Amino acid sequence: MSRLAVELPGLSMKNPIMPASGCFGFGKEFAGFYDLNHLGAIAIKATTVEPRFGNPTPRVAETHSGMLNAIGLQNPGLNNVIDNELARLADVDVPIVANIAGSTVNDYVEVAEAISRVDNVHALELNISCPNVKEGGIAFGTVPDVAAQLTQEVKRVSTVPVYVKLSPNVSDIVEMAQAVERAGADGLSMINTLLGMRLDLKRRTPILANGTGGLSGPAIKPVAIRMIYQVSQAVSIPIIGMGGIQSADDVLEFMLAGADAVAVGTANFTDPYVCPTIIDELPKRMDELGIERIADIVGGSWKQS
């Protein structure tokens, strides 16, 4: 086994690096830059039952050390994703993680049941940051019992492992992680974006048409590290860590905190080569730090104390 290889439920990865959902389209957008087979896995853009056109513009705003986005889960819908987007990735020899979203539990179940049966889908990533229209618009990921019920229903129909993507916009992320673990989650991905806002000084209104948006990029990295450090000590399922990763050192820091693999998000927008660059840099940094196998350092920051 390669010194960079990691094994997670449903995901045999040649290295621990995957592009994060929502920052890589459906993969083909980056195929002109480098060979996608270089990646450890690919997490595709969120898929919903019906096509979604997303929020009105502006949907993106720059911030110091990051960005705000309120895209609104724009995607071509379940059937199109299966027939076209996933079909285009059929020749890519890399595990595919399908991110799924919805407005009701039934929406999630319908997408999960269909997309998990596609041959090249190896795992699902459950986006629980979506508003639950049956519960007054409260996000699925802010109430442990609601998140657990959703996880349980998706697990019931999925033929592949299910990773629950946790929102940081909660009072106790450990409680949330434990709730979805009890409900059958095979793994976690964390963290999703932090809720934020920017104002236009001339118009005296929010820059984003949606008002608020998700903050991502290096600005949220310390929050992600802290949450992964806490959660990894409280659950027994693997974690895909994300939140501001842009270098090999960032990857090693996330894994020392307790992540078993990582996803690179916002950095793809500023450097489309960031993922293969990190992969190529990792062995050198591991040599410098005396690390033989990358999987051996997972949780090293707390396992040694």
Curated annotation (Swiss-Prot):
It is found in: Cytoplasm. This is Dihydroorotate dehydrogenase B (NAD(+)), catalytic subunit. It comes from Halalkalibacterium halodurans (strain ATCC BAA-125 / DSM 18197 / FERM 7344 / JCM 9153 / C-125). One of its GO terms (cellular component) is cytoplasm. It catalyses: (S)-dihydroorotate + NAD(+) = orotate + NADH + H(+). Pfam families: DHO_dh (PF01180). Its main location: cytoplasm. The lineage of its organism: Bacteria, Bacillati, Bacillota, Bacilli, Bacillales. PANTHER family: DIHYDROOROTATE DEHYDROGENASE (FUMARATE), DIHYDROOROTATE DEHYDROGENASE (QUINONE), MITOCHONDRIAL-RELATED. Its EC number is 1.3.1.14. NCBIfam families: PRK07259.1 (NF005574), pyrD_sub1_fam (TIGR01037). GO terms for biological process: 'de novo' pyrimidine nucleobase biosynthetic process; 'de novo' UMP biosynthetic process. It comes from the Bacteria.
